[in-house]
UniProtKB/Swiss-Prot annotation:
Zn(2+) 2 binds at residues 139, 144, 156, 161. This is E3 ubiquitin-protein ligase SINA-like 3. GO terms for molecular function: transferase activity; zinc ion binding. Pfam families: Sina_RING (PF21362), Sina_ZnF (PF21361). Keywords: Metal-binding, Transferase, Ubl conjugation pathway, Zinc, Zinc-finger.
Length: 303
């Protein structure tokens, strides 16, 4: 009884997740279909496993007293219902499986403008969120806490943070100068004229040299922030070039989306698999400024 009380108390303490929910037509028994067609649920917690609190999904099991559990929890409790001690994990709750399968919820980004409806399961929701056009993006300025959909972020950056040295024009070479400061991550934000897309050039000092990456701040939605870039570094007669036919997209500037997750490759061995430019230390001058040139083009406009 102690376990039941604790579970109940924890369930009451949890904040209720309320999102617009509808039930779509699904096949099956008449009773299951009728429930699916007519019901509207607001408390999404009702569709969570009462033991682990994760979203329910087939197979869903119930004991003879009607208590339910997901398949993984049945194994964890050794097929003994924690509420009544009867066997659980042998009889499936088919109607509840039909209901869960039929539930369609609004995207978590609905309040920002997304109108997509997605099945109520972790896999579908995660898959949509990865490519949702309304995923929030963060202002790259270190002291700024602004977040918003990418179009609003671009307007915000133009209004609040624009400088004379941070513009770029597609198809033309622009200066990309970065201060190299020890192991600290340095970055430069470039914005297409007016309130256009934001491109971030990042560099850091690694064991093999300076690593430079170029990313566009944009959601991973198809057709948004689709750019290519060409980067050039010169030191006397020496020249290193880097070309990315498909610029990576990020939502937030951080070390995690820089070279920490990339496998270092010497510049002379760099191939199509590399997504950063490596500049050996012996090619650096004594100045603390890394002077490069960058040409950014929209996908499909490459020459």
């Amino acid at each position: 009884m102690e376990n039941i009380t604790n579970n109940s108390e924890r369930s009451l303490d949890r904040p209720k997740r309320q999102r617009p929910v509808s039930m779509e037509n699904v096949g099956g028994t008449a009773s299951g279909s009728e429930v699916a067609r007519s019901a509207t649920l607001l408390e999404l917690d009702l569709l969570d496993c009462p033991i682990c609190y994760h979203k329910l999904g087939a197979p869903i099991y119930q004991c003879d007293n009607g208590h339910i559990a997901c398949s993984s929890c049945c194994k964890k409790v050794k097929y003994k219902c924690p509420y009544c001690s009867l066997r659980i994990g042998f009889f499936r709750s088919r109607i509840l499986e039909k209901i869960v399968e039929a539930v369609v919820v609004s995207c978590p980004n609905a309040k920002y403008g997304c109108t997509e409806k997605i099945p109520y399961d972790n896999e579908s929701e995660s898959a949509h969120e990865r490519v949702c056009e309304f995923t929030l993006c963060y202002c790259p300025e270190p002291e700024c806490k602004y977040t918003g959909v990418y179009t609003d972020l671009y307007r915000h950056y133009h209004a609040e943070h624009k400088t004379d040295h941070s513009w770029f024009k597609c198809g033309e070479y622009n200066n990309a100068w970065l201060h190299v400061t020890g192991e600290k991550l340095s970055f430069l934000v470039l914005q297409e004229y007016e309130d256009g897309p934001l491109v971030v050039v990042q560099c850091s000092m690694e064991s093999h040299g300076i690593c430079v990456t170029v990313n566009c701040i944009a959601p991973c939605a198809p057709g948004v922030g689709e750019f290519s870039c060409h980067l050039i570094y010169r030191n006397g007669s020496e020249k290193i070039t880097f070309e990315s036919k498909k610029m990576n997209k990020i939502q937030k500037v951080s070390p995690e989306n820089h070279v920490a997750n990339y496998k270092p490759i010497p510049y002379y061995l760099r191939g199509e698999a590399s997504n950063f430019m490596s500049i050996p230390y012996y090619l650096l001058d004594e100045a603390s400024i890394l002077k490069m040139q960058i040409c950014i083009r929209r996908s499909g406009e490459e020459v």
